[in-house]
């Protein structure tokens, strides 16, 4: 099953995350199928490729709780349901 989830990168004590599509059995920092965006919790900066996310959701990808919250904040989940 494909999941939309966060992949950590950055330095110690300064995490940044990429929003990626990955197989649910892969390690957190394993190989991603596709990069869909970026999230920095320190500066609360988010960059999302809406078209790619909607494409993956229509193909049946599931989201993790954190990614779902990020997408709700960006009002992308509402677009997907309409």
Swiss-Prot record:
One Pfam family here: Ribosomal_S16
Matches recorded under SUPFAM superfamilies: Ribosomal protein S16
Subcellular location(s) of the protein: Plastid, Chloroplast
An individual GO BP term: mitochondrial translation
GO CC terms, sorted: chloroplast; mitochondrion; small ribosomal subunit
InterPro entries, A to Z: Ribosomal_bS16 (IPR000307), Ribosomal_bS16_CS (IPR020592), Ribosomal_bS16_dom_sf (IPR023803)
Chief place of localization: plastid
UniProt entry keywords in alphabetical sequence: Chloroplast, Plastid, Ribonucleoprotein, Ribosomal protein
Gene Ontology molecular functions: structural constituent of ribosome
Family to which this protein belongs: Belongs to the bacterial ribosomal protein bS16 family.
Protein name: Small ribosomal subunit protein bS16c
Phylogenetic lineage: Eukaryota, Rhodophyta, Bangiophyceae, Bangiales, Bangiaceae
């Amino acid at each position: 099953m494909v999941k939309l989830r966060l992949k950590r990168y950055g330095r110690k004590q300064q995490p940044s995350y990429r929003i990626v599509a990955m197989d649910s059995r892969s390690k957190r920092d394993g190989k991603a199928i596709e990069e869909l965006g970026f999230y920095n919790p320190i500066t609360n900066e988010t960059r999302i490729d809406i078209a790619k996310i909607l494409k993956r959701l229509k193909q049946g990808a599931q989201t993790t709780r954190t990614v779902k919250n990020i997408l709700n904040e960006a009002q992308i989940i509402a677009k997907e349901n309409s």
